[in-house]
């Protein structure tokens, strides 16, 4: 049997607060709920899913590098590999909700482009219906797809797209 494609789901800053942070915008579903549903769905699509969340830009960049088999320098933190058993295992695609780093992080953009791993950008809220500073994304012009405003279902839509429509 062929090995399943490995997908990495990355969530950025403040997404660990889903379910309690501004529920009128983000809803009441927790990140844990989203990750559990994503694991179930990934299994049904014969995908292997690893999840990762960090409030720190450098940790997200390191995790993207690890997804391509690159590791941080020995002087850098080793905590990601210890906390994430999938770290360092090459992945076929990344689904990323970069949170506020969407609008600020050239570093995350460069990490995604530098690894060459195709990625889907996801946002729980419709960023285009919010404050003007949220309208610009440093990632969307390079993403295979962008999903926003669907609430937690956006993650499901991203996994469905990756599992059924992406060519690896």
From Swiss-Prot:
Its EC number is 4.2.1.10. It catalyses: 3-dehydroquinate = 3-dehydroshikimate + H2O. The active site is at 26 (proton acceptor), 123 (proton donor). PROSITE patterns: DEHYDROQUINASE_II. CDD domains: DHQase_II. The record marks 21 as: Transition state stabilizer. The keyword Zinc does not apply. Pfam families: DHquinase_II. Signal peptide: none annotated. GO terms for molecular function: 3-dehydroquinate dehydratase activity. The keyword Lyase applies. Substrate binds at residues 97, 103, 110, 124-125, 134. Pathway: Aromatic compound metabolism; 3,4-dihydroxybenzoate biosynthesis; 3,4-dihydroxybenzoate from 3-dehydroquinate: step 1/2. Keywords: Lyase, Quinate metabolism. GO terms for biological process: 3,4-dihydroxybenzoate biosynthetic process; quinate catabolic process. It is an enzyme of class 4 (lyase). Gene3D superfamilies: Dehydroquinase, class II. HAMAP family: AroQ. Homododecamer. Adopts a ring-like structure, composed of an arrangement of two hexameric rings stacked on top of one another. Is involved in the catabolism of quinate. Allows the utilization of quinate as carbon source via the beta-ketoadipate pathway. PANTHER family: CATABOLIC 3-DEHYDROQUINASE. Belongs to the type-II 3-dehydroquinase family. This is Catabolic 3-dehydroquinase. It comes from Neurospora africana. The lineage of its organism: Eukaryota, Fungi, Dikarya, Ascomycota, Pezizomycotina. The gene is qa-2.
